[in-house]
């Protein structure tokens, strides 16, 4: 059985004081225990990884793992401004987001680069969260499944059986930061299409890979989304900045 996983992506938000308050609030909320068979992680900006790692340890947050929002496609060397996977692992990261739509759009990241980053994460013992998704124009033209499955197929071609150690996050680009959200059924249909694409490579891999939904997940839609058979949790953006909202989603 696949565990339900909720990962908070803070994006370029937070500061030393607010990060401390967030972890304290989440620690209090998790004191009474969390639903069995679930995993949770938070991905702050690079400068705050060390702080958040320390806070998680200080509060004995066994339920909460640390993740990063990106990683270099290179191991080490003359890559100014890049952060290597081994560095993130040393900071205590267990997850790393790769191929987020904002990175694809703003930094022209291609599927090949995303796969290279996923390999770096895997080689350092972290779980890559590989993001895929379609734009509004692609959905409106009836090409949503074609686009997303093509993105998945390109990851399969590089990662092969190592996909079993990855997560996939479906993030409809038109729903990110807009307040719009795919209905639970629309999201389920795409998650099912992704799983079927994986099954063309290996049915065992397809049945074991967690597929998260990542488009404006909030406390008021998380229950319905997470009830769908092929939705294995959420990659949560804006709502994860509010610790009470994050807790509510984790408990949905």
Swiss-Prot record:
Keyword Cytoplasm carried by entry: yes
InterPro entries in UniProt: Aldolase_TIM, TIM_sf, TrioseP_Isoase_bac/euk, Triosephosphate_isomerase, Triosephosphate_isomerase_AS
Catalytic activity as recorded in UniProt: D-glyceraldehyde 3-phosphate = dihydroxyacetone phosphate
CC per GO annotation: cytosol
Function: Involved in the gluconeogenesis. Catalyzes stereospecifically the conversion of dihydroxyacetone phosphate (DHAP) to D-glyceraldehyde-3-phosphate (G3P).
Xref: PANTHER family: TRIOSEPHOSPHATE ISOMERASE
Protein name per UniProt: Triosephosphate isomerase
Gene: tpiA
